[in-house]
Amino acid sequence: MAIDDNKQKALAAALGQIEKQFGKGSIMRLGEDRTMDVETISTGSLSLDIALGAGGLPMGRIVEIYGPESSGKTTLTLQVIAAAQRKGKTCAFIDAEHALDPVYAKKLGVDIDNLLCSQPDTGEQALEICDALARSGAVDVIIVDSVAALTPKAEIEGEIGDSHMGLAARMMSQAMRKLAGNLKNSGTLLIFINQIRMKIGVMFGNPETTTGGNALKFYASVRLDIRRIGAIKEGDEVVGSETRVKVVKNKVAAPFKQAEFQIMYGEGINIFGELVDLGVKHKLIEKAGAWYSYNGDKIGQGKANAGNFLKENSAIANEIDAKLREMLLGNQDDKPDFTPAAHEVDEGSEAKENF
């Protein structure tokens, strides 16, 4: 609808005044020629990238990953760090639980020599560090592990048994208001790992809730619910777990999609097994009986052998991944590189059961 000349002049003057006072880009028309596509970072799982719709986790946003104990929350975030570092991005890990294992992180492909790490004393200190890193504009991905471990200063200085109603929720609410704008301006991805608690006296509906109040639920652009749904065995030995992730909230694509993948102890997400499954599903890989073939050449008998073939032939793995992303996401901007990096540990490293 056309605006009359007087209103147009008044609007132009107001916009000019706002840009003069607050800087260029502080206000604009939504349809202006400015990219609305959100840059993303791969989660390390192709099926989860597809479930997210945008091809990964969105930069400049807040993401919450929650689930029961030993469900793979920290493993998933370490895979995000590894994927970001392969793209030359700077990452930071705020270890509020004081439980980060650098040996395990290295096994997942994290360049620990270039990973910033902080073990804050209080929740306020952890969130101030996040804010300072975001405002610097030099850090691309920040992980906070976990919201439940962000203990308010008043609680630490008090005695065990003292009542501190709503302190953590108030601290998180204040931090979210401050962080959201700074993250958007700097394009920094902030991932909060969270734990599950049970609501007392819930007779109907889901009794589960997450810690830290409701502010994080509102400010998060993406919320992921991660669950361990089964064990992977070699003989009688458990070597990994079947994992399901549900996209509970998604502001950049359609929500409520699910992804299932394997997490192998000491190795992380079984990306090559995912490539085999998705390749067969979308007819890039042929399956005849137990044999798998790609472009007419047999690549292995059984899923495990086919996955090992792709692991040893990174060029073919990259090619299949690129085709799947083009087919299912319509882009290849954030495709990972499966060529082993120099900082990754040797194949013979002892596997470690660490979630």
Swiss-Prot record:
It holds the Pfam family RecA_C. GO terms for molecular function: ATP binding; ATP hydrolysis activity; ATP-dependent DNA damage sensor activity; damaged DNA binding; single-stranded DNA binding. Residues 331-355 are annotated as: Disordered. Disulfide bonds: none annotated. The keyword Transport does not apply. It comes from the Bacteria. GO terms for biological process: DNA recombination; DNA repair; SOS response. Keywords: ATP-binding, Cytoplasm, DNA damage, DNA recombination, DNA repair, DNA-binding, Nucleotide-binding, SOS response. GO terms for cellular component: cytosol. It is found in: Cytoplasm. ATP binds at G67, P68, E69, S70, S71, G72, K73, T74. Can catalyze the hydrolysis of ATP in the presence of single-stranded DNA, the ATP-dependent uptake of single-stranded DNA by duplex DNA, and the ATP-dependent hybridization of homologous single-stranded DNAs. It interacts with LexA causing its activation and leading to its autocatalytic cleavage. HAMAP family: RecA. Belongs to the RecA family. This is Protein RecA. It comes from Erwinia tasmaniensis (strain DSM 17950 / CFBP 7177 / CIP 109463 / NCPPB 4357 / Et1/99). The lineage of its organism: Bacteria, Pseudomonadati, Pseudomonadota, Gammaproteobacteria, Enterobacterales.
